[in-house]
């Protein structure tokens, strides 16, 4: 067997087949701003430091300052994902929907994370059903235009995407919706991230790598250094053939630059099988 594997590798190269492409590592643009504030430097300087670490892309918001987008592009950041906060619990949202679509078309992003807002206190089953219908209708519009639209497990009980059951209800209604798999939010909802991965694997189009201190401490720590099975999840993703983006998420960090370096090193080591 040891002799066969190198021969097989040579045959693949001779036939022009390249090794499977691995996922790329990205970060939230919000985190770049946090670095700028904490280090007392400009957004451009902070973005350059993050790029120097090795991050290849940035998740940005559809209302992001165009100057910031140009800076990211000039430094070589890839367009990992756009994020649209649209409050469907408050009713129809034509203006924000139009803004999200215009952003994708103008700036060349092909993936959209739809953060669906929080349902008002006291909302009824009928209210939730109506909000889901609005989400499904917009998802179909986005897909029809050739973009990927996704929702994520969101760490607030008032979200329609709070847990596996909530996501199930949305996915049953909308075949157009993909999933941004947030590694750290299923624990917040009392669900098992590995069970959720197996359940929603075919929907996953983007990943947020969020780690937590412990099951009873939801503070974020650099991916790969907390209680979330980051290595196992990333291993499953790679084995499945996923070669999209892994976006590091660590809101609340008091040392964002150092934590960004640690997270990048951890995830890189996982991808290398170390």
Each language-model region and where it sits:
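Sec-dependent N-terminal signal peptides
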Residues: 4-13
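N-terminal pre-domain/capping segments
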Residues: 15-106, 110, 178, 265-274
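Structural preference for beta-strand elements that scaffold enzyme active sites
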Residues: 24-26, 57, 78-81, 110-113, ...
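A cross-domain feature marking catalytic cores of carbohydrate-active enzymes
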Residues: 27-31, 60-62, 81-86, 114-116, ...
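Acidic-and-aromatic substrate-binding clefts and catalytic sites of carbohydrate-active enzymes
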Residues: 34-40, 57-69, 86-95, 120-123, ...
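Conserved, mostly hydrophobic/aromatic
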Residues: 50, 58, 104, 149, ...
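Active-site groove signature of glycoside hydrolases
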Residues: 104-124, 145-155, 247-248
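Acidic/histidine-rich catalytic cores of soluble enzymes
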Residues: 144-227
């Amino acid at each position: 067997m040891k002799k066969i594997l190198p021969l097989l590798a040579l045959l693949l190269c001779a036939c022009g087949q390249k090794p499977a492409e691995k996922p790329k590592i990205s970060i939230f643009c919000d985190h770049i701003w946090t670095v700028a504030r904490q280090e007392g430097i400009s957004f451009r300087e902070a973005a350059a430091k993050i790029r120097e670490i090795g991050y290849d892309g940035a998740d940005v918001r559809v209302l992001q300052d165009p100057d910031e987008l140009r800076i990211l592009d000039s430094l070589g950041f890839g367009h990992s994902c756009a994020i649209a906060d649209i409050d469907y619990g408050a009713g129809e949202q034509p203006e924000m929907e139009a803004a999200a679509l215009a952003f994708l078309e103008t700036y060349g992003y092909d993936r959209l994370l739809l953060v669906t807002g929080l349902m008002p206190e006291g909302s009824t089953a009928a209210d939730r059903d109506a909000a889901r219908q609005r989400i499904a209708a917009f998802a179909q519009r986005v897909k029809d235009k050739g973009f990927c639209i996704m929702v994520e497990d969101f760490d607030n009980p008032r979200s329609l995407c709070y847990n596996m059951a909530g996501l199930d209800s949305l996915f049953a209604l909308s075949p157009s919706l993909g999933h941004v798999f947030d590694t750290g939010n299923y624990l917040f909802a009392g669900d098992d991230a590995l069970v959720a991965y197996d359940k929603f694997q075919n929907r996953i189009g983007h990943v947020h790598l969020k780690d937590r201190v412990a099951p009873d401490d939801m503070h974020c720590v650099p991916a790969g250094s907390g209680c979330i099975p980051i290595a196992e999840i990333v291993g499953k993703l790679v084995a499945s053939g996923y070669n999209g983006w892994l976006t590091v998420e660590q809101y609340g960090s008091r040392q964002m630059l150092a934590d960004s370096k640690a997270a990048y090193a951890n995830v890189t080591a996982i991808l290398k099988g170390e």
